[in-house]
């Protein structure tokens, strides 16, 4: 917790998100990239990568 600044980067003066937001929890709750899937640590929602 407390390191959300690592999930953003600035390119050409614009802020770009590195990870996806959780569709259940909404903006502000990032999903973790586990290689074969995206997972939300708050609600447990998981999206499998192809």
Swiss-Prot record:
Pfam families reported for this sequence: Ribosomal_S27 (PF01599)
Single GO term (MF): structural constituent of ribosome
InterPro entries, A to Z: Ribosomal_eS31, Ribosomal_eS31_arc, Ribosomal_zn-bd
Cofactor note: Binds 1 zinc ion per subunit.
Residues holding Zn(2+): 22, 25, 40, 43
Span of zinc fingers (C4-type): 22-43
A biological process term (GO) from this entry: translation
One of the record's GO cellular component terms: ribonucleoprotein complex
Cofactor: Zn(2+)
Keywords: Metal-binding, Ribonucleoprotein, Ribosomal protein, Zinc, Zinc-finger
Transmembrane parts of this sequence: none
Complex and partners: Part of the 30S ribosomal subunit.
NCBIfam families linked: PRK00432.1 (NF001669)
Similarity-based family: Belongs to the eukaryotic ribosomal protein eS31 family.
Name the UniProt record assigns to this protein: Small ribosomal subunit protein eS31
